[in-house]
Amino acid sequence: MKMSKRKIFVSFDFENDRNYKYLLEAWNGNSDFEFEFDDKSTREINSWNISTIKAALTRKINEADYTIVIVGKEANKRHKDSQLIGYKNWQNFEIAKSKENGNKLIAIKINSLYESPEKLLNSGASWAYSFSEDAIMKAVRNA
């Protein structure tokens, strides 16, 4: 049974975890997978301007009903521009904006040893503890 297309923003570390995002997109395009979504994520934002990036991310987050957070190795690492971002890094910013927008949170922990973004803790997120379709679908249904 196919799930109806959920409007999902995917929060991930572009430098280190984009392959996981691309895998979600591939599942979405493959009828053999139950995982299906209306991708509200941004393409790479072609700007170094913090306020431009914030505005683009916020607009896309506000178009979504769900936010999937891919928790990779660097997910809670302090960004060099954290003071300007207003959060430890971009993923923490995206989680905070998702919570403000009322998005349901789904966290996918790639490795149990990876530190979760601080804004994800005590957020009521639904968790998947492996990057598998079954674990992710269960977390999506429980969100």
List each model region and its residues.
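Short, well-ordered alpha-helix to beta-strand connector turns
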Residues: A64-D65, G102
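Conserved N-terminal substructure of TIR/SEFIR domains
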Residues: M1-E63
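C-terminal interaction surface of TIR/SEFIR-family domains
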Residues: M1-K7, N111-A143
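Short beta-strand/turn micro-motifs composed of small residues
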Residues: F12, V71, K109
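Conserved TIR/SEFIR loop-to-helix hotspot centered on a Trp-containing motif
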Residues: A75-E100
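A short helix->loop->beta-strand "cap" motif at the edges of active sites that frequently abuts
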Residues: E100-I106
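Short catalytic/ligand-binding loop motif for oxyanion handling, primarily in non-cytosolic enzymes
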Residues: D17-Y20, N76-H79, L113-K119
